[in-house]
A protein has these predicted regions:
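Anionic-ligand anchoring segments at beta-strand to alpha-helix junctions in alpha/beta enzyme folds, i.e.
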Residues: 170-217, 419-422
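C-terminal non-catalytic interaction/assembly regions of soluble proteins
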Residues: 54-100, 388-457
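Glycine-rich oxoanion-binding loops at beta->alpha junctions
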Residues: 109-147, 193-243, 251-252, 278, ...
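Short glycine-rich or small-residue beta-strand-to-loop segments that form or flank ligand, phosphate
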Residues: 152-162, 217-220, 241-247, 273, ...
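N-terminal phosphate-binding or glycine-rich loops at protein starts, especially the Walker A/P-loop
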Residues: 17-24, 55-92, 143-193
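Accessory alpha-helical/coil subdomains and C-terminal extensions
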Residues: 234, 245-247, 253-272, 283-423
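Long, compositionally biased, glycine/small-hydrophobic-enriched stretches that function as flexible linkers
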Residues: 24, 34, 45-135, 142-144
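Short hydrophobic alpha-helical membrane-entry/anchor segments
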Residues: 2-12, 23-41
Length: 457
């Protein structure tokens, strides 16, 4: 195993989930025997390396009574995601982690290039010849790339608000201090703050001690990632060599451009992207932070809609929840509430006439109905203008909640049902603004710590 594989693997989107994560791996070669057949990890050009069987033609005994007992079946491949590796450009550097001395030898669970997490352990007989992802596990390394005393770190939060942002800021700051990093900046106002000196503030454990009790972001979020060159130059001018960027897809596109600029400038900096989406629509991880809190708050809104719908005759309780491109918040909240009659997701092809007919049938039968719709359904039910975008580059969605309310009342009037009422609830900003619940708080804590471990590795 080349020793360079132990060096820095931090890169854009490096901090992934609680159980899986890591800052990624450089391409390397390994020869390994696994249950009587040979496998080779071959280094490839580009961003991935494939684990392939050499002797796929050999028959293998099935272990146990069910197909899938083995991690890798004949014809399957494991794919490594390869982020940039600072050691490839600046040479190998190894420093003993200060955590050993800090915890007086009590820290034993170090990870290395052999510690992996596979995308799934679930199998069925039809999944032969599929490709699965493989990641290095998150966690502290015994040897790290950076000398922590020479690190200047910066943290920025971008995009919209999400429960748990302050927990992540707090966790990053505290773990950086654990490593002994002398200078930690918090950059206010998102990417736009990089260009303004008064947006760079010093962080320490005392300043972030209680911010996790509050919603929002102590660093203030903002959208937009223009002037990449100017931002990158400002970052380099401050001497930052460890950058933590918390945000969604638009934010990570910006992070990638910043990292590319630094590569061209031959500037040594570990750029770590920490995924933030309240919609939970990242396929690489099981849950994104803030999602569990959002579902809990969404259930409260649904319960209010149910109370309103059942508390008046011929009433429609209509609740709009977040979900730009996916309906995970709606799906989980609806299942948890167990009081919803119709759930509309962005993944569906929705027929408005059929929906209205169903609402009429339900009201005629029971006198009420509860409908929950994801914001992204506006792209299905209405015509969104692809040229209208927000500062983050996302297409602005028409308000499907108000649209549905109006269409329901138009339908009622056309059918002589002037006794119908619609109680419309849009809790979007209330949900985004709350502090993280205990589950999300714990997740953010571990996620932030692992992001620092990955950046140091």
């Amino acid at each position: 195993m080349p020793s360079d594989s132990k060096n820095n693997y931090a890169a854009v989107a490096a901090a992934a989930a609680t159980t899986a994560v890591a800052a990624g791996a450089a391409g390397y070669a390994v020869y390994k025997k696994m249950q009587g057949y040979d496998q080779t990890v071959s280094e490839l050009r580009g961003n991935v390396s494939h684990l392939q069987e050499e002797n796929a033609h050999l028959s293998r005994p099935v272990v146990g009574s069910m197909t899938g007992d083995d991690i890798l079946l004949p014809g399957e491949k494991l794919t490594y995601l390869k982020p940039s590796n600072l050691a490839e450009r600046f040479g190998k550097k190894e420093h003993t982690t200060p955590l050993i001395e800090k915890y007086e030898g009590q820290l034993q669970d170090f990870q290395d290039e052999h510690s992996i997490v596979t995308q799934t352990i679930y199998r069925n007989k039809d999944e032969h010849h599929k490709q699965f992802l493989r990641y290095l596990r998150a966690g502290p390394r015994e040897k790290v790339y950076f000398n922590p005393k020479e690190v200047t770190a910066a943290i920025v939060t971008c995009g919209g608000l999400c429960p748990g942002l302050n927990n992540v800021i707090r966790g990053l700051t505290q773990m950086l201090e654990e490593y002994g990093v002398p200078t930690i900046y918090g950059v206010k106002n998102g990417y736009k703050g990089f260009k303004k000196d008064n947006c760079w503030i010093k962080l320490d454990g005392k300043k972030v001690e209680t911010i996790h009790r509050m919603g929002g972001s102590a660093l203030v979020c903002n959208r937009g990632n223009d002037d990449i060159d100017v931002m990158a130059e400002a970052i380099m001018k401050k001497g930052v060599n460890m950058l933590f960027i918390v945000g969604g897809d638009g934010t990570h596109r910006g992070a990638d451009k910043i990292q590319q600029y630094m590569v061209k400038a031959n500037y040594e900096c570990s750029v770590v992207g920490i995924p933030k989406t309240i919609d939970n629509d990242i396929p690489v991880i099981d849950d994104s932070f803030g999602f569990a809190t959002a579902v809990s708050e969404a259930v409260r809104a649904i319960e209010a809609g149910y109370v309103e719908a059942t508390g008046a005759p011929n009433c429609i309780g209509l609740v709009k929840l977040m979900g730009r491109n996916s309906g995970f918040v709606v799906l989980h909240a609806v299942c948890a509430a167990a009081t919803v009659d119709v759930a509309l997701l962005p993944e569906m092809d929705i027929s408005l006439p059929k929906l209205l007919d169903h609402i009429k049938q339900k009201i005629d039968k029971d006198g009420h109905i509860v409908v929950v719709v994801a914001e992204g359904c506006g792209a299905t039910l209405m015509q969104a203008d692809p040229n209208l975008k927000d500062a983050g580059g996302n297409v602005k969605l028409p308000d499907v909640g108000v649209y549905l309310k109006d269409k329901i009342m138009e339908f009622a009037k056309a059918n002589g049902r002037n006794d119908w009422t619609v109680k419309y609830i849009d809790p979007t900003y209330m949900i985004r603004a709350v502090p993280a619940n205990p589950g999300d708080s714990t997740y953010c804590h571990v996620l932030a710590h692992n992001a620092v471990h990955g950046a140091m590795a």
